[in-house]
């Protein structure tokens, strides 16, 4: 098991004015998995991602990544741990417009004081894999949204993280670009990259090999694709969402 979330609670606020964002959340993710997280707004999806990403700490419970309990990390070690173990892809790309695409991609390796020779080698490898060789000398303002997201993915993967975390990665993209991006995610996953993705799109979720549904801060339901066609799997995801959103109305 690469990622283990055990009996995790997350409470915001104090005294009488508290909100329980996660309540006894349990989840395990194995090597080579591509997992999508779905649920209504406020269900706890983003909270879970933030806790795994070490942007926040649990109130109770344990999260382990590659056997290491995240709550034992000291503040001074968190940035390095995050840089070495995780890659991040967000809806709004988070690329720096004042830097070339190449420098955006290389930033995690620069921060890690990696040797220039290795940086160049990794840059060439990831650029070829993502088909962005011709974008490296350009700036983010000169390229499309889909291309910016590829730059962000290259930056996320260049340090060879154990886990790629994606929060609504196609949220700012049109449907054709979204499909291309999800095909890319699947291809990356097939090269043994573990991906955990929060999404509201059943189309995007159908590219994952497992979908977990969160309701009221708990794991409510999960489905595996198995040998199913993507169309049938997508329908099953949509049906599960309808049930999830209909319960308690």
Predicted regions and their residues:
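Generic alpha-helical segment signature
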Residues: 1-2, 230
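ABC family nucleotide-binding domain
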Residues: 2-3, 8-210, 214
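Conserved beta-strand-loop-alpha-helix hinge in the C-terminal portion
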Residues: 218-242
């Amino acid at each position: 098991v690469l990622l283990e979330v055990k009996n995790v609670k997350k409470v915001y606020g104090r005294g009488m004015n508290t909100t329980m964002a996660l309540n006894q959340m349990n989840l395990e993710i194995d090597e080579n998995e591509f997992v999508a997280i779905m649920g209504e707004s406020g269900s706890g999806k983003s909270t879970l991602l933030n806790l795994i990403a070490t942007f926040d700490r649990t109130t109770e419970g344990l999260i382990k990544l590659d056997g290491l309990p995240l709550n034992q990390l000291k503040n001074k070690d968190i940035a390095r741990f995050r840089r070495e173990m995780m890659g991040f892809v967000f809806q709004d790309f988070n690329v720096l417009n004042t830097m070339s695409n190449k420098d955006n991609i290389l930033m995690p390796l620069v921060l890690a004081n990696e040797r220039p020779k290795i940086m160049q080698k990794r840059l060439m490898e990831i650029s070829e894999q993502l088909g962005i060789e011709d974008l490296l000398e350009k700036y983010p303002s000169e390229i499309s949204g889909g291309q910016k997201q590829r730059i962000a993915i290259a930056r996320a993967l260049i340090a060879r993280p154990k886990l790629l975390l994606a929060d609504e990665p196609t949220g700012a993209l049109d449907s054709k670009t979204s499909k291309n991006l999800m095909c890319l995610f699947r291809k990356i996953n097939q090269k043994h990259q573990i991906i955990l993705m929060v999404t509201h799109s059943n189309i995007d979720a159908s590219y994952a090999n497992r979908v977990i549904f969160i309701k009221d801060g708990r794991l409510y339901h999960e489905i595996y694709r198995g040998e199913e066609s993507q169309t049938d799997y997508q329908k099953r995801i949509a049906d599960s969402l309808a049930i999830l959103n209909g319960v308690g109305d």
